[in-house]
Regions:
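Active-site groove signature of glycoside hydrolases
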Residues: 102-123
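Acidic (Asp/Glu)-rich catalytic clusters
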Residues: 7-11, 47, 69-79, 99-108, ...
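N-terminal binding-site loop/beta-alpha segment at the start of enzyme catalytic domains
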Residues: 1-79, 140
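Active-site mouth loops of central-metabolism enzymes
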Residues: 21-36, 83-93, 123-124, 215-225
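Beta/alpha (TIM)-barrel catalytic core signal, keyed to glycine-rich beta->alpha loops juxtaposed to Asp/Glu
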Residues: 118-291, 295-304, 308-311, 318-333, ...
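Acidic-and-aromatic substrate-binding clefts and catalytic sites of carbohydrate-active enzymes
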Residues: 56-65, 87-94, 121-124, 155, ...
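Short, acidic/polar
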Residues: 31-45, 91-106, 152-161, 227-234
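Structural preference for beta-strand elements that scaffold enzyme active sites
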Residues: 5, 12-16, 51-52, 79-83, ...
Length: 376
């Protein structure tokens, strides 16, 4: 296993296990975790050098933390690192949630603690509730070793957070699709500019880059692994990446990802060009080809942040396509429930002003209506 230096001589495995997609007893939304299989995956990861395990208060209906803690309980506490997250939407009582997490994990401290999924729209909730100063105090007391946040917002919001508070690390969505077609490259460069270690989530874009359409497969560089392996290699090759998380749900994924992380092979310029071409083909296939120009926002009587809403919709459609199950992908829209009601898709009046001003001619009210129905 390849390792990356963090702070204070800490060495983190380049591959981390994301405990959001643990094996289930049967396919489907909110089905029970297959605990024996989950433990088998974790044991295999530990045996092959993976030492970073990421969970959250809401994963697997609150069961992820307990299962992870039990699986790791047989190993020396200094042989692994656990990352956990405070979710203000799940329970704004941050003191209760933090203690509940320690109890679920069966641990006296959490190595890497994050504010969960900050966006431009939810940043104020985290900043105003008092949780930041509380968690900084927990760090002083040793109950948190490193404090950061996971992020799904704009580069401007990321820069503001970095310049306002002190963080030990930040976790962003980074993959070659978002690098070439989204804002991942900008976010990465901002973090490098501020000398903040980067933890990576969604290296295969919710599964989209692991299940490429045929015309994209033809462009994939020959040899050296599957589409998922190429996606992981792209991210692991970047300087300053501390950990690349993968939500692995079966042993085949675990074994392949460990082999990829062990290889440490750098991508050539020609290979990077091929991945860029694949990302462009995927962009043209994406459900809603919104470019984020915001002409729609300037003319929306409800003041909706339409590009952000459509971005959530695209995440939902991407995951649904990757999983082959729309119901299992609806969670991608759940972050919109954190918005004030007048900013949610249901607030759309259907006036059509957005479509009239959209250079792409998108039927935005139809997407708003679909999201509203899915969120009910």
């Amino acid at each position: 296993m390849k390792y990356a230096g963090f702070k204070e001589n800490i060495k983190l495995s380049k591959l981390g296990l994301g405990a959001m997609r643990l094996p289930q007893t049967e396919p489907g939304l909110a089905k029970p975790v297959d605990e024996p299989k989950a433990r088998e995956l974790i044991d295999y990861c530990m045996a092959h050098g993976v030492n970073y395990y990421d969970t959250a208060y809401i994963y697997h209906g609150g069961k992820s933390e307990t299962i992870l803690g039990q699986a790791l309980s047989g190993y020396p506490r200094d042989s692994y690192y656990v990352a956990d997250k405070f979710n203000v939407q799940a329970n704004p009582d941050y003191q209760f949630q933090f203690q509940d997490q320690l109890d679920r994990l069966g641990m006296e401290y959490i190595d890497f603690y994050l504010l969960h999924g900050i966006t431009d729209l939810t940043a104020a909730d985290y900043e105003s509730c008092g949780c930041i100063s509380y968690f900084q105090e927990q760090k002083k007391q040793g109950k948190i070793r490193h404090f950061g946040f996971s992020f799904h917002g704009t580069p401007d919001c990321l820069r503001r957070l970095l310049e306002t508070y002190s963080w030990d690390f930040v976790q962003i969505q980074l993959n070659y699709y978002d690098w070439y077609q989204g804002t991942a490259k900008q976010q990465y460069e901002i973090l490098r500019e501020h000398d903040v270690p980067v933890m990576v989530m969604e290296p295969v874009h919710g599964g989209m880059l692991a299940s490429l359409p045929e015309d994209c497969m033809e462009l994939l560089p020959k040899g050296n692994g599957s589409p998922a392996a190429w996606a992981l290699r792209f991210v692991m090759d970047l300087p300053g990446i501390a950990v690349v998380l993968s939500g692995m749900s079966d042993m085949e994924q675990v074994k392949e990802n460990i082999i990829t992380a062990d290889s440490g092979q750098s991508l050539t310029g020609a290979e990077l060009s091929q991945l860029a071409r694949i990302s462009e083909k995927l962009r043209k296939k994406i459900a809603v080809p919104c470019t984020g120009c915001r002409y729609c926002c300037d003319n929306c009587p409800q003041g909706l942040d339409i590009p952000s809403l459509l971005s959530a919709y695209n995440d939902y459609r991407d995951e649904a396509a990757a999983l082959g199950d729309k119901n299992m992908a609806v969670w991608r829209l759940h972050r919109l429930k954190a918005l004030e009601k007048e900013k949610q898709p249901a607030a759309c009046m259907g006036c059509g002003s957005c479509t009239a001003h959209c250079p792409q001619g998108l039927d935005i009210p139809a997407y708003m209506q679909e999201m509203s129905a899915l969120l009910q």
